[in-house]
Amino acid sequence: MSEYQPSLFALNPMGFSPLDGSKSTNENVSASTSTAKPMVGQLIFDKFIKTEEDPIIKQDTPSNLDFDFALPQTATAPDAKTVLPIPELDDAVVESFFSSSTDSTPMFEYENLEDNSKEWTSLFDNDIPVTTDDVSLADKAIESTEEVSLVPSNLEVSTTSFLPTPVLEDAKLTQTRKVKKPNSVVKKSHHVGKDDESRLDHLGVVAYNRKQRSIPLSPIVPESSDPAALKRARNTEAARRSRARKLQRMKQLEDKVEELLSKNYHLENEVARLKKLVGER
Protein backbone atom coordinates (compact mmCIF):
# COMPACT_ATOMS: atom_id res chain seq x y z
CA MET A 1 0.00 0.00 0.00
CA SER A 2 1.44 3.37 -1.05
CA GLU A 3 1.56 6.32 1.29
CA TYR A 4 -0.73 8.36 -0.99
CA GLN A 5 -3.44 5.68 -1.13
CA PRO A 6 -5.96 5.95 1.77
CA SER A 7 -6.67 2.96 3.98
CA LEU A 8 -9.36 0.60 2.74
CA PHE A 9 -10.55 0.00 6.30
CA ALA A 10 -11.30 3.66 6.90
CA LEU A 11 -14.47 3.56 4.81
CA ASN A 12 -17.04 0.82 4.69
CA PRO A 13 -17.36 -0.66 1.20
CA MET A 14 -21.15 -1.06 1.77
CA GLY A 15 -21.53 2.67 2.13
CA PHE A 16 -22.22 2.73 5.92
CA SER A 17 -20.17 4.17 8.73
CA PRO A 18 -18.97 1.72 11.45
CA LEU A 19 -20.39 3.99 14.15
CA ASP A 20 -23.91 4.22 12.78
CA GLY A 21 -25.50 1.38 10.82
CA SER A 22 -28.62 3.36 9.82
CA LYS A 23 -26.95 6.35 8.11
CA SER A 24 -25.13 6.29 4.80
CA THR A 25 -21.52 7.32 4.21
CA ASN A 26 -22.51 10.51 2.47
CA GLU A 27 -24.36 11.74 5.58
CA ASN A 28 -21.38 11.00 7.84
CA VAL A 29 -18.82 12.73 5.64
CA SER A 30 -19.73 16.18 6.87
CA ALA A 31 -19.72 15.06 10.52
CA SER A 32 -16.41 13.22 10.22
CA THR A 33 -14.65 16.10 8.46
CA SER A 34 -15.67 18.48 11.26
CA THR A 35 -14.33 16.23 14.03
CA ALA A 36 -11.27 14.33 12.76
CA LYS A 37 -10.20 13.06 9.34
CA PRO A 38 -8.55 9.64 9.05
CA MET A 39 -4.85 9.77 8.38
CA VAL A 40 -2.94 7.63 5.89
CA GLY A 41 -2.41 4.10 7.15
CA GLN A 42 -5.00 4.46 9.89
CA LEU A 43 -6.72 1.17 10.79
CA ILE A 44 -10.37 0.64 11.47
CA PHE A 45 -9.64 -0.12 15.14
CA ASP A 46 -8.64 3.51 15.67
CA LYS A 47 -12.23 4.52 15.07
CA PHE A 48 -13.34 2.78 18.30
CA ILE A 49 -10.83 4.53 20.58
CA LYS A 50 -12.75 6.72 23.05
CA THR A 51 -11.59 10.30 23.23
CA GLU A 52 -12.79 13.15 25.38
CA GLU A 53 -13.45 15.30 22.28
CA ASP A 54 -15.89 12.76 20.74
CA PRO A 55 -19.37 14.11 21.55
CA ILE A 56 -21.12 10.92 20.41
CA ILE A 57 -19.43 8.55 22.90
CA LYS A 58 -19.45 11.02 25.80
CA GLN A 59 -22.05 10.07 28.40
CA ASP A 60 -23.40 11.71 31.51
CA THR A 61 -22.00 10.47 34.82
CA PRO A 62 -24.20 9.79 37.86
CA SER A 63 -22.85 12.96 39.45
CA ASN A 64 -24.60 15.01 36.78
CA LEU A 65 -27.99 13.44 37.54
CA ASP A 66 -30.33 15.25 39.90
CA PHE A 67 -32.93 13.29 41.83
CA ASP A 68 -35.89 15.16 43.18
CA PHE A 69 -37.65 13.24 45.98
CA ALA A 70 -40.17 15.93 46.74
CA LEU A 71 -43.79 14.92 46.47
CA PRO A 72 -45.46 16.52 43.47
CA GLN A 73 -48.32 18.80 44.32
CA THR A 74 -50.18 18.16 41.09
CA ALA A 75 -50.62 15.22 38.76
CA THR A 76 -51.21 15.41 35.05
CA ALA A 77 -53.85 13.34 33.32
CA PRO A 78 -52.90 10.94 30.51
CA ASP A 79 -54.11 13.40 27.86
CA ALA A 80 -51.70 16.08 29.27
CA LYS A 81 -54.44 18.70 29.08
CA THR A 82 -55.98 18.70 32.56
CA VAL A 83 -54.10 19.01 35.85
CA LEU A 84 -55.47 17.07 38.86
CA PRO A 85 -54.60 18.28 42.38
CA ILE A 86 -53.30 15.67 44.89
CA PRO A 87 -54.92 15.99 48.36
CA GLU A 88 -52.45 16.69 51.16
CA LEU A 89 -52.29 14.33 54.15
CA ASP A 90 -52.92 15.67 57.59
CA ASP A 91 -49.80 15.93 59.79
CA ALA A 92 -51.56 14.24 62.72
CA VAL A 93 -52.49 11.23 60.60
CA VAL A 94 -48.93 10.86 59.31
CA GLU A 95 -47.46 11.08 62.82
CA SER A 96 -49.94 8.53 64.14
CA PHE A 97 -48.91 5.97 61.50
CA PHE A 98 -45.17 6.46 62.01
CA SER A 99 -45.23 6.79 65.80
CA SER A 100 -43.15 4.20 67.73
CA SER A 101 -45.40 4.12 70.78
CA THR A 102 -47.11 0.78 71.35
CA ASP A 103 -49.66 2.16 73.82
CA SER A 104 -51.58 4.24 71.31
CA THR A 105 -53.58 3.16 68.30
CA PRO A 106 -53.59 5.54 65.32
CA MET A 107 -57.15 4.68 64.29
CA PHE A 108 -58.77 5.26 67.71
CA GLU A 109 -58.48 7.97 70.33
CA TYR A 110 -58.43 6.74 73.93
CA GLU A 111 -58.29 10.13 75.65
CA ASN A 112 -62.05 10.55 75.54
CA LEU A 113 -62.73 6.96 76.59
CA GLU A 114 -60.53 7.06 79.69
CA ASP A 115 -62.30 10.14 81.03
CA ASN A 116 -65.77 8.59 80.80
CA SER A 117 -64.93 5.07 81.97
CA LYS A 118 -67.55 5.21 84.74
CA GLU A 119 -70.30 5.80 82.23
CA TRP A 120 -69.63 2.60 80.29
CA THR A 121 -72.42 0.04 80.14
CA SER A 122 -71.74 -3.21 81.95
CA LEU A 123 -71.45 -6.42 79.98
CA PHE A 124 -73.05 -8.42 82.81
CA ASP A 125 -76.39 -8.09 84.54
CA ASN A 126 -75.72 -6.71 88.04
CA ASP A 127 -79.40 -6.40 88.93
CA ILE A 128 -79.78 -10.06 89.99
CA PRO A 129 -79.98 -10.11 93.81
CA VAL A 130 -77.82 -12.69 95.58
CA THR A 131 -78.77 -13.57 99.15
CA THR A 132 -77.22 -15.68 101.88
CA ASP A 133 -79.92 -18.33 101.45
CA ASP A 134 -78.84 -18.92 97.89
CA VAL A 135 -75.23 -19.43 98.97
CA SER A 136 -76.21 -21.80 101.79
CA LEU A 137 -78.26 -23.87 99.37
CA ALA A 138 -75.28 -24.03 97.03
CA ASP A 139 -73.00 -25.18 99.88
CA LYS A 140 -75.43 -27.93 100.83
CA ALA A 141 -75.63 -29.04 97.22
CA ILE A 142 -71.83 -29.24 97.04
CA GLU A 143 -71.63 -31.28 100.26
CA SER A 144 -74.28 -33.70 99.06
CA THR A 145 -72.46 -34.26 95.78
CA GLU A 146 -69.17 -34.91 97.56
CA GLU A 147 -70.71 -37.43 99.96
CA VAL A 148 -72.21 -39.50 97.17
CA SER A 149 -69.48 -41.56 95.52
CA LEU A 150 -71.50 -42.65 92.50
CA VAL A 151 -73.70 -39.99 90.95
CA PRO A 152 -76.66 -41.39 88.95
CA SER A 153 -76.87 -40.44 85.31
CA ASN A 154 -80.45 -39.14 85.57
CA LEU A 155 -79.59 -36.55 88.24
CA GLU A 156 -80.97 -33.12 87.30
CA VAL A 157 -79.27 -29.94 88.53
CA SER A 158 -81.62 -27.27 89.85
CA THR A 159 -81.49 -24.11 87.78
CA THR A 160 -82.99 -21.90 90.50
CA SER A 161 -80.02 -22.09 92.87
CA PHE A 162 -77.16 -19.59 92.62
CA LEU A 163 -73.49 -20.28 93.04
CA PRO A 164 -71.57 -18.25 95.66
CA THR A 165 -70.29 -14.95 94.31
CA PRO A 166 -67.70 -12.58 95.80
CA VAL A 167 -70.19 -9.66 95.88
CA LEU A 168 -73.24 -10.02 98.12
CA GLU A 169 -75.95 -7.43 98.63
CA ASP A 170 -77.53 -8.56 101.90
CA ALA A 171 -74.63 -9.45 104.20
CA LYS A 172 -71.10 -10.72 104.30
CA LEU A 173 -70.86 -14.45 104.57
CA THR A 174 -68.53 -16.14 106.99
CA GLN A 175 -65.84 -18.32 105.64
CA THR A 176 -67.30 -21.72 104.94
CA ARG A 177 -65.61 -24.67 106.43
CA LYS A 178 -63.63 -26.93 104.19
CA VAL A 179 -65.38 -30.15 103.38
CA LYS A 180 -63.14 -33.18 103.55
CA LYS A 181 -63.50 -35.47 100.61
CA PRO A 182 -64.12 -39.08 101.53
CA ASN A 183 -61.46 -41.54 100.61
CA SER A 184 -62.04 -43.59 97.52
CA VAL A 185 -61.34 -46.79 99.44
CA VAL A 186 -63.82 -47.33 102.26
CA LYS A 187 -62.86 -49.85 104.90
CA LYS A 188 -65.73 -52.17 105.63
CA SER A 189 -66.25 -53.12 109.26
CA HIS A 190 -66.17 -56.84 109.78
CA HIS A 191 -69.06 -57.96 111.91
CA VAL A 192 -68.84 -61.42 113.38
CA GLY A 193 -72.02 -63.27 112.51
CA LYS A 194 -73.31 -66.79 112.54
CA ASP A 195 -71.58 -67.62 109.26
CA ASP A 196 -68.22 -66.43 110.59
CA GLU A 197 -68.65 -68.36 113.84
CA SER A 198 -69.29 -71.55 111.91
CA ARG A 199 -65.98 -71.10 110.06
CA LEU A 200 -63.92 -70.88 113.26
CA ASP A 201 -62.10 -73.95 114.54
CA HIS A 202 -61.54 -75.07 118.12
CA LEU A 203 -58.68 -72.58 118.49
CA GLY A 204 -60.93 -69.59 117.73
CA VAL A 205 -59.35 -68.78 114.36
CA VAL A 206 -60.62 -69.15 110.82
CA ALA A 207 -60.41 -72.78 109.77
CA TYR A 208 -58.90 -73.81 106.47
CA ASN A 209 -59.22 -77.08 104.62
CA ARG A 210 -55.98 -78.96 104.51
CA LYS A 211 -55.69 -81.28 101.56
CA GLN A 212 -54.34 -84.65 102.52
CA ARG A 213 -52.28 -86.27 99.80
CA SER A 214 -52.33 -90.04 99.68
CA ILE A 215 -49.53 -90.17 97.11
CA PRO A 216 -46.52 -87.89 97.33
CA LEU A 217 -45.75 -85.56 94.49
CA SER A 218 -43.72 -86.96 91.64
CA PRO A 219 -40.21 -85.58 91.26
CA ILE A 220 -39.67 -82.91 88.67
CA VAL A 221 -37.73 -84.10 85.64
CA PRO A 222 -36.84 -81.53 82.97
CA GLU A 223 -38.19 -82.48 79.57
CA SER A 224 -35.19 -81.22 77.64
CA SER A 225 -31.79 -79.64 78.11
CA ASP A 226 -33.21 -76.22 77.40
CA PRO A 227 -31.90 -73.68 79.95
CA ALA A 228 -35.38 -72.18 80.32
CA ALA A 229 -36.92 -75.60 81.03
CA LEU A 230 -34.21 -76.40 83.58
CA LYS A 231 -34.76 -73.09 85.33
CA ARG A 232 -38.52 -73.65 85.37
CA ALA A 233 -38.03 -77.09 86.95
CA ARG A 234 -35.76 -75.70 89.65
CA ASN A 235 -38.26 -72.93 90.46
CA THR A 236 -41.10 -75.44 90.74
CA GLU A 237 -39.10 -77.64 93.09
CA ALA A 238 -38.13 -74.65 95.23
CA ALA A 239 -41.79 -73.57 95.46
CA ARG A 240 -42.78 -77.05 96.62
CA ARG A 241 -40.17 -77.00 99.35
CA SER A 242 -41.28 -73.53 100.45
CA ARG A 243 -44.92 -74.60 100.71
CA ALA A 244 -43.91 -77.72 102.62
CA ARG A 245 -41.91 -75.70 105.13
CA LYS A 246 -44.78 -73.22 105.56
CA LEU A 247 -47.24 -76.06 106.17
CA GLN A 248 -44.89 -77.66 108.68
CA ARG A 249 -44.49 -74.37 110.52
CA MET A 250 -48.25 -73.82 110.67
CA LYS A 251 -48.68 -77.32 112.05
CA GLN A 252 -46.08 -76.68 114.74
CA LEU A 253 -47.73 -73.38 115.70
CA GLU A 254 -51.13 -75.08 115.99
CA ASP A 255 -49.67 -77.75 118.25
CA LYS A 256 -48.00 -75.09 120.37
CA VAL A 257 -51.25 -73.14 120.70
CA GLU A 258 -53.14 -76.27 121.76
CA GLU A 259 -50.48 -77.03 124.36
CA LEU A 260 -50.62 -73.49 125.78
CA LEU A 261 -54.41 -73.56 125.89
CA SER A 262 -54.36 -76.82 127.83
CA LYS A 263 -51.85 -75.42 130.31
CA ASN A 264 -53.93 -72.29 130.74
CA TYR A 265 -57.00 -74.41 131.40
CA HIS A 266 -55.22 -76.42 134.10
CA LEU A 267 -53.81 -73.28 135.70
CA GLU A 268 -57.22 -71.64 135.84
CA ASN A 269 -58.63 -74.73 137.52
CA GLU A 270 -55.77 -74.73 140.02
CA VAL A 271 -56.35 -71.06 140.85
CA ALA A 272 -60.03 -71.68 141.35
CA ARG A 273 -59.32 -74.62 143.68
CA LEU A 274 -56.87 -72.59 145.75
CA LYS A 275 -59.32 -69.72 146.10
CA LYS A 276 -61.92 -72.13 147.28
CA LEU A 277 -59.58 -73.51 149.95
CA VAL A 278 -58.68 -70.02 151.13
CA GLY A 279 -62.34 -69.11 151.38
CA GLU A 280 -63.17 -72.13 153.49
CA ARG A 281 -60.51 -71.28 156.09
Swiss-Prot record:
Gene Ontology MF annotations: chromatin binding; DNA-binding transcription activator activity, RNA polymerase II-specific; DNA-binding transcription factor activity; DNA-binding transcription factor activity, RNA polymerase II-specific; identical protein binding; mediator complex binding; RNA polymerase II cis-regulatory region sequence-specific DNA binding; RNA polymerase II-specific DNA-binding transcription factor binding
Region (Required for transcriptional activation): 89-100, 106-125
Major localization listed first in the record, in broad terms: nucleus
Gene3D superfamilies registered for this protein in UniProt: Classic Zinc Finger (3.30.160.60)
Renumbered ranges of motif Nuclear localization signal: 167-200, 231-249
Substitution effect: D196E: In strain: CLIB 388, CLIB 410, CLIB 413, CLIB 630 haplotype Ha1, K1, YIIc12 haplotype Ha2 and YIIc17 haplotype Ha1
Residue span of region Disordered: 217-248
InterPro entries: AP-1_TF_bZIP (IPR050946), bZIP (IPR004827), bZIP_sf (IPR046347)
Name of the protein this chain belongs to: General control transcription factor GCN4
Gene name of the encoded protein: GCN4
